[in-house]
Curated annotation (Swiss-Prot):
Residues 1-8, 63-83, 142-158, 218-232, 285-286, 357-364, 427-431 are periplasmic. It comes from the Bacteria. The keyword Membrane applies. It is a multi-pass membrane protein. The lineage of its organism: Bacteria, Pseudomonadati, Pseudomonadota, Gammaproteobacteria, Enterobacterales. This is Inner membrane transporter YgjI. One of its GO terms (cellular component) is plasma membrane. It comes from Escherichia coli (strain K12). The gene is ygjI. Keywords: Cell inner membrane, Cell membrane, Membrane, Transmembrane, Transmembrane helix, Transport.
Length: 477
């Protein structure tokens, strides 16, 4: 990007971008089901102690690679070299595979609310089969061009935000007016039970507070430079943390956490609110269902091809075959998108085999999505630790405090993430076969494949090319 286009984003613009990238009402539902009111303080702590420092870590990498518009591959390469840069970029795509498995059943549930006015209860087998058909359709649409999806998704996302804020306002009004909450709001209810199961669910909180990598890239584009960026990110983190916490406190005013479902929880809480205020419940179900369905279906169609396109545009040529990465007339690597479809199929089938209900299925899928989502930030944190420990001399306009401060902060984050990742990979009460073949097996196979692919790639390079590829900061001008 040219210098004339730099410093064009105002503080409010960055605040809006940050909010859009991080906050999601569905995250409130998911964590409320697992943690109840204890999710309220955990959301606030996660945004303060994870989101803000991780944003600053990314901002420092962006500052180090200020002459590059590339993303995570360039950031990690500047500290750990090409192999770990490829592994990290690969894990970002890899996480999206699990994201699809958790998104598809929600699309189906919200379609049911939108067109029927209620959630049609299906078995895990039926849900999985319909999800596979839906994902095949979304892959076909996304590879054949979906130009109108952006504006549609933007409008429905805005409507969902307005619905969320209206719920918070009306639920708060009802609470002040003397309504008896479905779940009592007490200090004791907000104190987490610090056990192994809780440690595993904390990854759900961290996943909800994610999005730093999509915001921190604007550090060079903000009016006022890095100082303004830091101020806005801290303010945004506090604001989002408070909003998540307030949402978590108010989510059970009308509906108990025990009654909420992963698939249609958003509609359930609005249904409860409509019943309290005497609004037409069926109409509310259809409206919230339609907005949620449109937003999620649009997101599904857009994200089916986008991660593949980003991944193959970042990594060096030659790691994957030319036909695999070849773009079609719509600028999408169609063959890679269909390979992605084939990979997602077993990721949907395996957890289905160990689930008695759709709620069990969603629990397994979301848990694994959260566990997998820990890997990319963890690799970036390790890269940052190496940057501050061994390469702190490299010139950059922005640093997250002194060398010692940076090392201490990132070391604490690495420790928390490592424990959370292990706890969510080996959850209590889970089917042992599901853990072995899905949780552990999936990660080992995918990361092992990435390691093998990169090793095969560097064998075809000259000695000089291997040296450049392996050397940290070789991409930093």
């Amino acid at each position: 990007m040219s210098d004339t286009k730099r410093n064009t984003i105002g503080k409010f613009g960055l605040l809006s971008l940050t909010f859009a990238a991080v906050y999601s009402f569905n995250n409130v539902i998911n964590n409320n089901i697992e943690l109840g009111l204890a999710s309220a303080p955990m959301f606030f702590l996660a945004t303060i102690f994870y989101f803000i420092p991780f944003c600053l870590i990314i901002a420092e990498f962006v500052s180090l690679n200020k002459n590059s518009e590339a993303g995570v591959y360039a950031w990690v390469k500047s500290s750990l070299g090409g192999r770990w840069a490829f592994i990290t970029a690969y894990t970002y795509w890899f996480v999206n595979l699990f994201f699809f498995t958790s998104l598809l059943p929600r699309v189906i549930a919200y379609a049911s609310y939108a067109f029927l006015g209620y959630e049609y209860i299906m078995t895990p087998v039926a849900t999985t089969i319909i999800s596979m058909v839906l994902f095949a359709f979304s892959t076909w649409v996304s590879t054949n061009g979906a130009k109108m999806l952006g504006p549609i998704t933007s409008v429905t996302s805005t409507l969902m935000l307005l619905l969320t804020l209206s719920y918070i306002l009306l639920a708060g009004t009802a609470l002040v007016g003397g309504v008896q909450p479905a779940d009592a709001i007490t200090v004791d209810a907000m104190i987490p039970n610090f056990n192994w199961a809780f440690l595993g669910v904390t990854t759900w909180i961290f996943m909800a507070a994610g999005g730093a990598e999509s915001v921190a890239v604007y550090v060079n584009d903000v009016k006022g430079g890095s100082k303004s960026f830091v101020k806005v990110i801290i303010l945004a983190g506090i604001f989002i943390g408070v909003l998540y916490s307030v949402s978590s406190v108010l989510i059970n005013v009308f509906v108990s956490s025990k009654e909420l479902k992963f698939t249609g929880g958003s509609v359930q809480v609005f249904h409860g609110m409509a019943a309290y205020f005497g609004l037409p419940e069926a109409l509310m179900n259809r409206f919230v269902g339609l907005v949620s369905f449109t937003a999620m279906f649009g997101s599904l169609l857009m994200w089916t091809a986008t991660p593949v396109k980003i991944f193959f545009s970042e990594i060096p040529e030659g790691i994957f075959g030319k036909k695999t990465v070849e773009l079609n007339e719509n600028g999408v690597p169609a063959r890679a998108a269909w390979i992605q479809f084939l990979i997602v199929i077993p990721l949907m089938i395996i957890p289905m085999l160990g689930s008695n209900t759709v709620q069990d299925l969603m629990n397994t899928i979301i848990n694994m999505t959260a566990a997998a989502s820990m890997l990319p930030p963890l690799f970036i944190m390790l890269a940052y630790l190496n940057l501050r420990a061994k390469l702190d001399h490299l010139p950059r306009d922005f640093r997250m405090g002194s060398r010692r401060t940076g090392i201490i902060v990132v070391s604490m984050l690495i420790a928390i993430f490592a424990v959370g990742f292990v706890a969510s990979t080996f959850p209590t009460g889970a089917n042992i076969l599901t853990i072995i073949f899905y949780n552990v097996g999936g990660i080992v196979i995918f990361l092992g494949f990435a390691w093998w692919k990169y090793s095969k790639y560097i064998k075809g390079l000259t000695a000089e090319e291997r040296h450049i590829e392996a050397t940290p900061a070789s991409n930093v001008d």
